[in-house]
Regions:
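Structural signature of hydrophobic alpha-helical transmembrane segments
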Residues: 1-8, 97, 146, 291-292, ...
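N-terminal alpha-helical transmembrane segments of multi-pass membrane transport
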Residues: 1-95, 245-248, 261, 265-275, ...
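Cytosolic juxtamembrane amphipathic/interface segments immediately preceding
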Residues: 19-20, 81-90, 129-130, 154-163, ...
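Hydrophobic alpha-helical hairpins/lids featuring a short glycine-rich hinge
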Residues: 65-135
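Juxtamembrane inter-helical linkers in multi-pass membrane proteins
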Residues: 123-157, 224-246, 293-297, 321, ...
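Alpha-helical membrane segments and immediately flanking helix-loop junctions
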Residues: 130-190, 319-414
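Long, contiguous bundles of hydrophobic transmembrane helices that form the permeation core
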Residues: 204-257
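Transmembrane helical segments that form the transport core of multi-pass membrane transport proteins
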Residues: 252-350
Length: 421
């Protein structure tokens, strides 16, 4: 039940960081929290909800089988299961088995947008949030879009209106981008060994969670002037000519994302190894040769992990993963977490096996784009659309990243409560 204390703590932190505490709309905040809790309960505690989630994750996972056809054509025997017979776990080549999934899923999502399926889903979910929470149509559409597309692409959904948004709406747009992950990378995380059903649940919990934290930290104090928003979805600039063009464009976007992910992982993992080597060398002088970045971050964030529901004896490890995600990115953190998920991987890496309880909580805590480098990504995208608001965006950047982080941690705390029942 420690997770209840964690939930209260996260809300208090958001209130403490609020720009206008007296203007907080408690109806909006309360309903957003209830929706986030209900999604968590539906996915993890209600038997029927677990069945639906399992079916949904099974459907998404089946896409991997179709993606494998393209992967096998490009890489031949290098993508064959026989690689595991020869190299053991070394037969899993990230660049072959995970990055191409991002390319395929990017193309698939683009096709769904072109034929109107994604637009219908976003309008349905976003419209429901708008009616229940009383938030503007822009905010509701953007946080819903963030479930499926990346933080750089989210503002493009409502590009003509970015310059006219109130400060609170703009902050909600930014928090929504930080709190979610793109649907195109879900299969990438799953390819590392992370449970797909938990990733899907975390994505849907991020929408109300983002609005919860955004409206606590930056309540609405102005009159929104964007309620006459047109159906931006389907009327976007540079819309694909036909379904083939949509598939090709999505594949190109997916390729850029895959190359970016691969480059970041190569650089960051190598830099972490270098930094850990230096820390170990320095720590050796003081009798701590095992000193690493993960260990330092783990001790700093262990209390937060504990409040989420992680047992204290695993809190340092969990805190290390959360710290990696904040300082570097979620892909690096998930790649590190993957070593702790199964007995075989843990034995090979020489690390302890995490309990299922902790695995679930950490999976939810990491499922978001909120990290320091993402601030630059968001500012670059938004200032390109609304350069006249550059200074305001810069002031909101760090606070929005914190809001996205609090949203992810709130999902983890809620899940921690339900799995402890």
């Amino acid at each position: 039940m420690i997770s209840l204390v964690g939930i209260a703590t996260l809300i208090l932190i958001a209130i403490a960081l609020s720009h206008q505490r007296r203007s907080i709309n408690w109806r909006t905040v309360s309903v957003a929290f209830v929706i986030q809790v209900l999604i968590g309960a539906f996915a993890l505690y209600v038997p029927w909800g677990q069945t639906v989630l399992a079916s949904l994750s099974g459907a998404v996972a089946s896409l991997q089988l179709y993606a494998n056809k393209g992967i096998e054509f490009l890489f031949g025997g290098l993508s064959s299961p026989h690689m595991f017979e020869v190299f053991g776990s070394g037969g899993f080549v990230f660049a072959i088995r995970v990055l191409p999934m991002i390319v395929f899923f990017g193309s698939f999502i683009s096709v769904l947008y072109y034929i109107g399926v994604m637009g219908w889903i976003i309008r349905l979910v976003g419209g429901t949030l708008r009616l229940l929470l009383g938030t503007s149509r822009i905010e509701s559409m953007v946080v819903t879009s963030a479930i499926f597309i990346g933080q750089s692409e989210v503002p493009l959904v409502v590009r003509p209106f970015i310059a006219k948004l109130t400060r609170s709406e703009l902050f909600a747009v930014m928090v929504g981008g930080f709190a979610a992950v793109a649907g195109s990378v879900l299969l990438g995380y799953a390819g590392l060994g992370v449970e797909l059903k938990y990733l899907i649940a975390a994505c849907f919990m991020s929408a109300p969670g983002a609005l919860l934290m955004a409206k606590l930290m930056e309540p609405e104090t102005e009159a929104a002037c964007t309620e006459q928003v047109v159906e931006a979805l389907g009327q976007a600039e540079n819309r694909p000519t036909n379904i083939i063009d949509a598939a090709a464009e999505g594949a190109q976007v997916g390729l850029r994302l895959a190359l970016s992910v691969g480059a970041m992982l190569l650089a960051f993992i190598a830099l972490i190894a270098l930094f850990n080597g230096l820390l170990g060398w320095a720590g050796n002088w003081f009798g701590y040769p095992q000193l690493t970045l993960q260990l330092v971050l783990g001790h700093v964030l262990a209390p937060i992990a504990f409040l989420l529901g992680v047992p204290w004896h695993e809190a340092v490890l969990a805190g290390g993963f959360i710290g990696e995600k904040l300082v570097l990115n979620e892909f690096v953190a998930y790649a590190d977490l993957a070593n702790y998920l199964t007995p075989a991987k843990a034995a090979e890496a020489g690390v302890p096996l995490l309990s299922v309880h902790t695995q679930v909580i950490v999976t939810f805590a990491l499922c978001g784009f909120a990290n320091l480098s993402s601030i630059a990504i968001q500012l670059g995208g938004l200032t390109g659309i609304a350069p006249q608001r550059r200074q305001e965006l810069a002031r909101l950047g760090l606070r929005a990243m914190i809001g996205g982080t609090l949203s992810n941690l709130m999902s983890a705390a809620i899940v921690g409560f339900f799995i402890s029942l």
